[in-house]
């Protein structure tokens, strides 16, 4: 008679229990962050161009960024859109950044389905005026108390419909392609490109 190895029931039960515990652990860990009610579910990443709306959303602000020039000049870049279904025009009354008043050049009331595009004057000079559409361009300027690139500051827009407060990233305008020479690491960076 040949000897056959016989597995004990204890070993099989232990393996089954181990597989069950592993599967239950994986399921429990995966379900921890699967729900919508998490600590970070309502946080918006601090990236260029944050957006928000007022109560009932007759006016939206998009692409909100505090721009700094290389000369230290500051302004707010944003687009305000009137999407009021009652065909009412709305007025931008004021903008503040971290409590500091922003100067707005002649902002006219925003008609239904029209936009107000604002930025530093040097950036607006690069934009071509559209031949169609309902867009007004407004220059903004702001006292720069020492904003740091990559920082986040609160921006409050006050419209005739109410206030919209949003956190905006502080950024530099995009450099023109091929104009700026960025030296990285001195001679080692130059030598690595040969």
Curated annotation (Swiss-Prot):
Name this protein carries in UniProt: Uncharacterized protein Cgl2664/cg2949
Keyword terms of this UniProt record: Signal
Domain of life of the organism encoding this protein: Bacteria
Nuclease recorded as keyword: no
Keyword Oxidoreductase: no
Subunit structure: Has been detected in a cytochrome bc1-aa3 supercomplex; its deletion however leaves complex activity unaffected.
Residue pairs linked by disulfide bridges in the UniProt entry: none
Signal peptide residue numbers: 1-30
Source organism of this protein record: Corynebacterium glutamicum (strain ATCC 13032 / DSM 20300 / JCM 1318 / BCRC 11384 / CCUG 27702 / LMG 3730 / NBRC 12168 / NCIMB 10025 / NRRL B-2784 / 534)
């Amino acid at each position: 008679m040949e000897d056959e190895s016989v597995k004990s029931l204890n070993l099989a039960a232990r393996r089954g229990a181990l597989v069950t515990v592993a599967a239950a652990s994986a399921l429990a860990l995966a379900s921890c962050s699967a729900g919508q009610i998490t600590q970070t579910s309502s946080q918006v990443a601090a990236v260029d161009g944050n957006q928000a709306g007022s109560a009932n959303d007759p006016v939206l602000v998009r692409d909100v960024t505090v721009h700094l020039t290389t000369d230290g000049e500051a302004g707010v870049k944003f687009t305000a859109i009137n999407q009021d279904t009652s065909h009412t025009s709305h007025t931008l009354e004021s903008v503040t950044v971290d409590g500091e008043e922003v100067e707005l050049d002649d902002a006219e009331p925003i008609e239904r389905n029209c936009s107000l595009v604002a930025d530093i004057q040097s950036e607006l000079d690069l934009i071509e005026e559209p031949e169609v559409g309902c867009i007004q361009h407004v220059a903004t300027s702001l006292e720069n108390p020492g904003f740091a690139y990559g920082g986040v500051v609160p921006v409050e827009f006050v419209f005739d419909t109410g206030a919209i407060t949003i956190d905006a990233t502080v950024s530099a305008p995009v450099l023109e392609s091929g104009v700026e020479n960025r030296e990285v690491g001195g001679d080692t960076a130059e030598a690595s490109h040969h």
